[in-house]
């Protein structure tokens, strides 16, 4: 009789640990051009460099991404023999693409953020990159800026 109760408790605890997807879309009561201007100003303030974008869109990148914006898991590296060591992310990068489309006198804003980090395998004197998982923090900052 205990097993079902323990199993239920385990599932409830596990569900409490799960994070939902980051909110990356919102409708804002402003024209799309104004929304993109607000988000662009926020990206500039955060140290992003804007790259060419299409009308109704904005693209930017940063080579100094903050750890609060994404979770970069440690990586297990080796030398090909028996030696293994865990390494942490070093330099972090972020790329953001923002679109703002007209939506009945408002703007439908969508933010697509991608993160990656450099890792160093000191055993082989080699570097590599891995993707990192968003925390939703950057997206929330940009959506707040979109609202003014």
Task: List where the protein language model places each region.
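C-terminal motif of bacterial Sec signal peptides marking the signal peptidase cleavage site
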Residues: 13-16
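Bacterial N-terminal signal peptides that target proteins for export
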Residues: 1-7
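Ser/Thr-rich, low-complexity intrinsically disordered terminal regions
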Residues: 18-148
